[in-house]
Amino acid sequence: MELIIPCLVAFAASFLTFFSGFGLGTLLLPAFILIVPIQEAVLLTAIVHMLNNLFKIVLVGKHIDWNIAVKFAIIAIPAAILGGYCLDLVQDFDSIHAYTFSNEVHEITYVKIILGLLMLFFASVEFIPTWKNIQFPPKLLPIGAMLSGFFGGLSGHQGALRSAFLVRSGLSKEAFIASGVFIAIAIDATRIPYYFCSFQQQNEMGSMNLWAFPTLCAFLGAFIGNKFINKVQITSVKIIVEILLTLIATLLITGLL
């Protein structure tokens, strides 16, 4: 049961991306936070995110605009390392406050507040149509690459920023999708080894079974959805998911998670 519930949660969160209108990382991070410590949750989300995009790149890779994709990735990669470093940094800060609730001690920490606020912000960006459709001029592409890489390394939230800065770059629909997938893989391939090295040094990697199987189930959810389901958005599901994301983020910020 200890393993079945995390696997079901991971599979369901990944599968819901095809009905809720939210991105894979936006849903998986809070789902994994319910299962494992924060840093491991960020790592597991990154692994599933990259596996899913490696599957996509096989299908759309021929459409990559290498000029824009490489320019974006070159800036995003060091920014992702910086984001990962900042995650390490705030993780080591002392807790802000500790309190007892239901006979359990809960801590409000900087890393919980930061990730909780980022979860709230990016969930709102993907939920509110006017926010989701924000676009930036091509001249700001380097800034977009830096921001996308940094927040990708810090919390995994990279897709919304990447799209907002790429959408006016003159790319065809196919090139936009393919280039975005390539950039996402570049960021994930950078931050995942960094996370592994950092967490192993801090002895913060949990039991292999406790995160390997949920990670596999999350990938299976994304793979099955990609393979067999036309992506549709159901408004009621989107609203319910937004409420759940807000609840999890609030619990994280207040130290209850």
Explain the meaning of each model-derived region:
Residues V42-L43, V70, K112-L115, I177, ...:
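Hydrophobic/aromatic positions within or immediately flanking transmembrane alpha-helices
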Residues E2-L3, F32-M50, H106-L117, M146-G156, ...:
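Structural signature of hydrophobic alpha-helical transmembrane segments
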Residues I38-L44, N67-I68, G170-I183:
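Membrane-interface alpha-helices at helix entry/exit sites of multi-pass transporters
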